[in-house]
């Protein structure tokens, strides 16, 4: 039962970008719509769980949500440039590397020879995986400069996601307590970042569904942690990239050559393998 719970976040999160693209709209309306759904879900969860909310939790959770919005809107902007299958694998790899390196520097996570070796191998696997998934073929190449623009946008996205995760951990805030203030920050951040682009339209409403998926994944992650631990739940939650990557090719019709498909598959395996090793360093 615990393993099943730990897999559910991957299923939910792995479908977010697929659903978002299917619902239509641009990155701005998609981001706002996602936060509407997430805020609705978080409000319901707060009513049922009613965790204690101190001023620190409210402020830090809100700031965390603001940076999530920065990460999400830039990830969706990258999807418009590179497509879901390429964006999600590179984005996942960048996030894993960034959070791991920051964890070592700020929280001194890798303190033994074993964890240092495992962590180093994990990062190397993830980096190679990212390179594999971003390879182009001449017959299916990105327009000149498109990949570079996408990668630069993803760096901004990764920074947003990094602060979103790290600040909660820095202040040692429980996930249940953070849900509502984070969701409020996500919504406010999305509105501020997209206000010039008139994001409130029918596509924003449709994309509330992707926000509900995000909330569902978050819920199952919190439920699985006490049952299977971080070392198991963390890598399992990252396997959603398989759903996103190949779902985009199958259901969204993203065109890839045979060579690209092989390298995307290899890259996904390497990134997941790296995530598993990172999970072992957290054991």
From Swiss-Prot:
CDD domains: glucose_uptake_GlcU (cd23112)
A GO term from the CC aspect: plasma membrane
Signal peptide interval: none
Membrane topology type: Multi-pass membrane protein
Record-annotated membrane-spanning stretches: 4-21, 26-48, 52-71, 84-106, 110-132, 151-173, 178-195, 208-230, 234-253, 260-279
Gene Ontology molecular functions: carbohydrate transmembrane transporter activity
Principal localisation: membrane
This protein's UniProt keywords: Cell membrane, Membrane, Sugar transport, Transmembrane, Transmembrane helix, Transport
InterPro entries: Sugar_transport
Subcellular location(s) per record: Cell membrane
Pfam families named in the record: Sugar_transport
Similarity remark: Belongs to the GRP transporter (TC 2.A.7.5) family.
PANTHER family hit by this protein: TRANSMEMBRANE PROTEIN 144
Record protein name field: Putative sugar uptake protein BA_0200/GBAA_0200/BAS0200
Species of the source: Bacillus anthracis
Taxonomic classification: Bacteria, Bacillati, Bacillota, Bacilli, Bacillales
